[in-house]
From Swiss-Prot:
Keywords: Chaperone, Cytoplasm, Protein transport, Translocation, Transport
Origin species: Aeromonas salmonicida (strain A449)
SUBUNIT field: Homotetramer, a dimer of dimers. One homotetramer interacts with 1 SecA dimer.
Gene from which the chain derives: secB
Name assigned to this protein: Protein-export protein SecB
Function in brief: One of the proteins required for the normal export of preproteins out of the cell cytoplasm. It is a molecular chaperone that binds to a subset of precursor proteins, maintaining them in a translocation-competent state. It also specifically binds to its receptor SecA.
InterPro entries with a match to the protein in the record: SecB, SecB-like_sf
Molecular functions (GO terms): unfolded protein binding
Single GO biological process annotation from the record: protein folding
Length: 156
């Protein structure tokens, strides 16, 4: 019986404790005259994630979305959302933990952040903005490949 317990694999642990909005900001510096212009926006999305260790196996992940919308040279609006979550993660080796924190957790947070951006843009009286889904796994793989290339260059 004891051998059966010892031979069982330790299962990974993942729990969402909380998802919350940490910070929001919306600026429309060139209103109301910007509403008179033909709407052909140049929309730029910047994303960032940060991880804070809160306790052993407890992490805060913060996804920041910054959307800048310009008409020609004038800023129509600037919208920033910090969507955060507290996650309990255990029994994962380091490479999988890094992937979980950098890709899996932001993937959970993104729909909340996207909704917050869409609501603020709409309340600013601008046309609807629907941000496309983001492949955080691909971004993580790209980041890891860049880090490996930089390490190889540094060692050469």
């Amino acid at each position: 019986m004891a051998d059966e317990i010892n031979n069982q694999e330790v299962q990974p642990e993942f729990h969402i404790q909380r998802v919350y909005t940490k910070d929001v900001s919306f600026e429309a510096p060139n209103t109301p005259h910007i509403f008179q212009k033909e709407w052909q926006p140049d929309v730029k999305l910047d994303m960032d994630t940060k991880t804070n260790i809160l306790a052993d196996g407890v992490y805060e992940v913060v996804l920041t979305l910054t959307v800048t919308c310009k008409l020609e040279t004038e800023t129509a609006f600037l919208c920033e959302v910090q969507q955060a979550g507290i996650f309990t993660i255990g029994n994962l080796p380091e490479p999988q933990l890094a992937h979980c924190l950098a890709a899996f957790c932001p993937n959970i947070l993104f729909p909340y952040a996207r909704e917050a951006v869409a609501n603020m843009v709409s309340k600013g009286s601008f046309p609807q903005l629907n941000l496309a889904p983001v492949n955080f796994d691909a971004l993580f793989a790209q980041h890891m490949a860049q880090a490996q290339a930089q390490q190889a260059t540094a060692e050469a």
